[in-house]
């Protein structure tokens, strides 16, 4: 059975998951953090046991070498040759990539060229790709893009009402993100509903520290809440979501900050952190709200309220909806947020059971059996989607 590794490289981190394919059995997973520092942390889980090591890891190539050596040392693989495919998460594929792609010198250059669209993420993803090429040069590698699933959006969804030449010259448009997650949970929802995805109108709510909503009709994304960048859409942990663009020069004028500094505030100091003044972590906010902290309660209402509005908007866009899906850290685990989001949607045919809504972190229907619109909790699995694409594109199946 081929072994395939799914990789998510950040600027100073490397997440990994090793699969036996096509059974999709997870052999091990882990993360290398603080790459580039003397006190880098190597975490790996084997047979449910977590192993942690603190050691200097100067760069991603060293992290990759260490990871592979560790797999042999722990007896997970006998030799590097057992790894037959590598899948890399790449945040931005622009308009160039509407599907995952086998990485060649040419496609790698194209991914690098897209870095101005995702300056925080794509360069780190490229570093991860190059590190694996250095250590395992002959193993086929596949890039899986966060944006690819949303490339089916029609122009009316992805165009901004700006001068049209900005789109033609600079590629300014809505791209959307979390595509691999939205694709996984909508495909899984169709399986759980026992209906062909081609017949379904689904609304997928990926709610983590970053959050996005997607309208998926017939298995294709037709609209999503994030935009040209992951800053757009609903309020998030530290991101503002949609605001009036004229606020940017106004804040600059009032505070003396530069445009870059204001964008940094919108990305890192806004959202629920900005509203509460103390945390972007939903668990802290729910705890504070339960103790009567009014700003914490307000942050929850703002967060859930924006999601609630997107659901109404996307239901209108698709002339109805068959199921609403909650996924990612908050979507899978917070019954409080789900309840606030779903409150008042009975007019649309959404009837949910408060007892079933107590579920955390596992697949479940939380709607009543008679509810015309089903509501599901589905833990996302982006890594398995990456592994499946490696099998498909590297012809390992």
UniProtKB/Swiss-Prot annotation:
Record EC number: 2.7.2.1
Co-factor remark: Mg(2+). Can also accept Mn(2+).
Sites where the protein binds ATP: 15, 206-210, 281-283, 329-333
Entry GO CC: cytoplasm
Subcellular location: Cytoplasm
RNA-binding recorded as keyword: no
UniProt-recorded Gene Ontology molecular function terms: acetate kinase activity; ATP binding; magnesium ion binding
This protein's name: Acetate kinase
Organism: Anoxybacillus flavithermus (strain DSM 21510 / WK1)
